[in-house]
Amino acid sequence: MSLSNKLSIEDVDLKGKRVLIRVDFNVPLDAEKKVTNPQRIAGAIPTIKYALDHGAKAVVLMSHLGRPDGKPNPKYSLKPVVPELEKLLGKKVTFAPDCVGPEVEEIVNKADNGEVILLENLRFHIEEEGKGTDAEGNKVKADKAKVEEFRKNLTKLGDVYINDAFGTAHRAHSSMVGIDLPVKAAGFLMKKELQYFAKVLESPQRPFLSILGGAKVSDKIQLIDNLLDKVNTLIVCGGMAFTFKKTLQNMPIGNSLFDEAGAKIVPDLVKKAEKNNVKLVLPVDFTIADKFDKDANTGYATDKDGIPDGWMGLDCGEESVKLFTQAINESQTILWNGPAGVFEFDKFAKGTKATLDACVKAAEEGRTVIIGGGDTATVAAKYGVEDKLSHVSTGGGASLELLEGKALPGVVALSERQ
């Protein structure tokens, strides 16, 4: 699956067409149904505006919100998104009460002069995800014939299909893979994600460093395994470093996280790193705590003595940060997935913040720094540096699967450049 060879919205003639765009408006709402973080809506605006500026007859937006499990639920209606979308777009938006059916088709077919229509939540229909729960809460599967019909009915709403929902690209849902139009192209958000991931996965500038943190080794085995074929240096930090330290160096880790399943694989991963000439960097000192709490008592431990019983490592120490910074400074391409400590607690955020500072400096010097979604994207947002890095991915699960070497159904479904 080549990432850099997909059709994008700029390659497509939109004049006089109904442009059906799969967006990701899965935004948080408060008790008053107000959007609390409009970032995802703002992210889709350039694609919508491009379609309007290039003569689209109508722009039809489809999205999911939350997990209604295949049945209508007013709590997950997309209607509260309308005022926020109108504000950001600077024009009126028509809300359709469903995402398929005669009433929706009539609204779409009457639309002209660049009218913008937002469809109701796709996941109110079990046919979007292919599964859901019934009224009693039992798991149910969608009927195959009905899924086909649902996809045909969505297809009726456009002449051109644009996918701008990278965060859902790893899901083979109807709106991602089932739209049967001759032209299926990436929107600007999707295009940027594909460009940057192509940069690291298909032709990285070397030396190439990957920083992997987070809790469990077993969750990241495929990721580590795939990246060991691509990187020059690998930093293992965060909770999963303790599984490496205990397994490889027999370091006492006290009550720190230990992943039994992951520990069995560690020697194989280290062998592969040696075989591929990949430099493995592990933390050498730790900020420790007497409990998992923001107000815990703190201490310091090195890997020489290990972590005493009754204490747990929640961050890496200054010597580790020096090693990480040196590796960052020596690299041209840096891919970061998973924090270096429990950054949610201020006492244990230093290692993550120092690593982030080194990454920002690298990006400012013109090197490529990519943050792979999820918790690490939250870190970049927490310290307000998203625009100081080359790319912060919007898709946690999707970026993880790409980096594991998997093909993403939503990307595979897009047309290739001729």
Swiss-Prot record:
- Which residues are connected by disulfide bridges in this protein? none
Q: Which residues form the signal peptide?
A: none
Has the keyword Kinase been applied to this entry? yes
Group of enzyme by EC: transferase
Q: Which GO molecular function, any one, fits this protein according to its record?
A: metal ion binding
Record HAMAP family: Phosphoglyc_kinase
Gene name, Swiss-Prot/TrEMBL: pgk-1
The entry's family comment says: Belongs to the phosphoglycerate kinase family.
- Which reaction(s) does its UniProt entry say it catalyses? (2R)-3-phosphoglycerate + ATP = (2R)-3-phospho-glyceroyl phosphate + ADP
Instruction: Kindly provide the name given to this protein in its UniProt entry.
Output: Phosphoglycerate kinase
Q: Give the cofactors, semicolon-separated.
A: Mg(2+)
InterPro entries associated with the record = Phosphoglycerate_kinase, Phosphoglycerate_kinase_CS, Phosphoglycerate_kinase_N, Phosphoglycerate_kinase_sf
Q: Which CDD domains has this protein been placed in? A: Phosphoglycerate_kinase
Residues reported in the UniProt entry to bind Mg(2+) = 215, 219, 375
Q: Which pathway or pathways does this protein act in?
A: Carbohydrate degradation; glycolysis; pyruvate from D-glyceraldehyde 3-phosphate: step 2/5
Tell me which Pfam families the record gives.
PGK
